[in-house]
């Protein structure tokens, strides 16, 4: 498809972004072109927008960023047989090689050569985005476009919570950003006996209650370690989901976990974190697991099942919608933490 499109461009050397006209992407024989209907802002996008140390070390602007979206397929490559024009889709945003040992043994989510849409390649904050056909996930016709756009981050929450979780356990979610809020909903829907949401942001703690938290702890007012202990009869949480990336919160996550419990870390600290491995992991017999992306496509199937069955109610997490040209409003809300999920409409 020839012509230009409007897109959100990350420029080098400074915070912010610009809304510009750029060429519509050209697809190869294995790719599809999608007209974007909705694109949501992720914490990773905020790192890029802010141009922090992580962004400076990882991305190579100028380029189109953004990676969470839904849309309609408008063009398919000549070798594509699994996707058709007109289909309503979202996409797995980790583009893998398919040839390394993890890929060949069913662990594509930890492919050694992963490229991430909108981080390592041009992304979806635009009118059009291209994707390998192998990454496409087909959406049911009745799914709202904004909800379809947040299936990818919901997959992060599902992967974080459901890896090793069993019904009836006590779960603590540390950090109630959008994915943390989704993790609260997933834990509650999946049979957790108790879901404790921990954050310093009162706005997001209120959202956590809407998403199903049984208890909330404001770290500005309360000691999270003492309160988790009190709420769990001194046992600690069976599963702690660390979503904040703050060094203190990471150390506290290990301490608040029950002996023999699990700590799942999805967050991305900007710098190395010092922990007491001997006392907080080894002697407690903890299982600590890093969570990256989504299992392909087991996690997507779980997300689809939870949404279509009505088991999980995720819409309250979408708090704001803006035309894409008003992106600055959305990013400012994300930077201040005065929102759940923000969706941009091209």
Swiss-Prot record:
One of its GO terms (molecular function) is zinc ion binding. It is an enzyme of class 1 (oxidoreductase). Its main location: cytoplasm. The active site is at 44 (charge relay system), 47 (charge relay system). GO terms for biological process: L-threonine catabolic process to glycine. Zn(2+) 2 binds at residues 97, 100, 103, 111. Keywords: Cytoplasm, Metal-binding, NAD, Oxidoreductase, Zinc. It comes from the Bacteria. It is found in: Cytoplasm. Its EC number is 1.1.1.103. This is L-threonine 3-dehydrogenase. It comes from Bacillus licheniformis (strain ATCC 14580 / DSM 13 / JCM 2505 / CCUG 7422 / NBRC 12200 / NCIMB 9375 / NCTC 10341 / NRRL NRS-1264 / Gibson 46). The lineage of its organism: Bacteria, Bacillati, Bacillota, Bacilli, Bacillales.
């Amino acid at each position: 498809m020839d012509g230009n499109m409007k897109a959100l461009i990350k420029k080098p050397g400074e915070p912010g972004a610009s809304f510009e006209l750029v060429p519509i992407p050209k697809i190869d024989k294995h790719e599809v072109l999608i007209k974007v209907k909705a694109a949501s802002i992720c914490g990773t996008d905020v790192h890029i927008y802010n141009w922090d140390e992580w962004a400076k070390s990882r991305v190579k602007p100028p380029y189109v960023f953004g990676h969470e979206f839904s849309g309609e397929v408008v063009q398919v490559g000549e070798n594509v047989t699994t996707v058709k024009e007109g289909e309503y889709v979202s996409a797995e945003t980790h583009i893998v090689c398919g040839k390394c040992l993890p890929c060949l043994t069913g662990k594509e989510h930890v492919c050694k050569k992963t490229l991430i849409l909108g981080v390592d390649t041009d992304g979806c904050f635009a009118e059009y985005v291209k994707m390998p056909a192998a990454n496409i996930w087909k959406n049911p016709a009745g799914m709202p476009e904004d909800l379809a756009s947040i299936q990818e981050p919901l997959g992060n929450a599902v992967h974080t919570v459901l890896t090793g979780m069993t019904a009836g356990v006590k779960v603590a979610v540390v950090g109630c950003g959008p994915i943390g809020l989704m993790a609260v909903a997933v834990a509650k829907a999946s049979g957790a006996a108790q879901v404790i949401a921990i954050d310093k942001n009162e706005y997001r703690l209120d959202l956590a209650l809407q998403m199903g938290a049984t208890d909330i702890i404001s770290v500005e007012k309360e000691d999270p370690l003492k309160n988790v202990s009190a709420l769990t009869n001194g046992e600690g949480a069976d599963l702690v989901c660390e979503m904040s990336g703050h060094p203190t919160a990471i150390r506290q996550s290990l301490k608040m976990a029950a002996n023999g419990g699990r700590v799942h870390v999805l967050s991305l600290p900007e710098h190395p974190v010092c922990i007491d491995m001997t006392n907080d992991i080894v002697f407690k017999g903890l299982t600590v697991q890093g969570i990256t992306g989504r299992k392909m496509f087991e996690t997507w199937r779980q997300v689809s099942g939870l949404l279509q069955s009505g088991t999980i109610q995720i819409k309250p997490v979408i708090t704001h919608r803006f035309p894409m040209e008003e992106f600055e409003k959305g990013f400012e809300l994300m930077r201040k933490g005065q929102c759940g999920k923000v969706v941009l409409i091209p």
